[in-house]
Amino acid sequence: MKTIRIFLVLISFCAFAKAQNAPTTSSVDHLAFELGIGEHQQINAVEVTFLEVMEDSRCPKDVDCVWAGRAKVKVRIEEKGLNPVEKEVVFDASGKDNILHISDDLVIKAVRLSPYPETSTAKNNRVYYLELQV
């Protein structure tokens, strides 16, 4: 009986050890940065400008809401040799990727709009920052 227990423990150990995934490493390091309203950043041949916050109806941190709300911002993407493009980016509860630009060697995503609303801060006193990831 003792032999069977030891055998089962060894089999279980082997099964769990085999199920472990080897850590993956990425050859690309992600760069994250913030832009204030009116600020721009050059990334390779692409310039991103944070133009405005069009809407911020996100539910404040310290309140229970029926609807999570959303934030909508406008950005301008200028790529060398092409006409500038203005895009609206929506941050909502879906958590979907907000990809601003894709090329062969570059993906630019809008990750977050800060600060997240609080009832203690008046809406017109907020200094917004758009966090981007490359």
Set out the residue ranges of the language-model regions.
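Surface-exposed, beta-sheet-biased, low-hydrophobicity segments with strongly acidic/polar composition
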Residues: 20-134
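Bacterial Sec-dependent N-terminal signal peptides
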Residues: 1-23
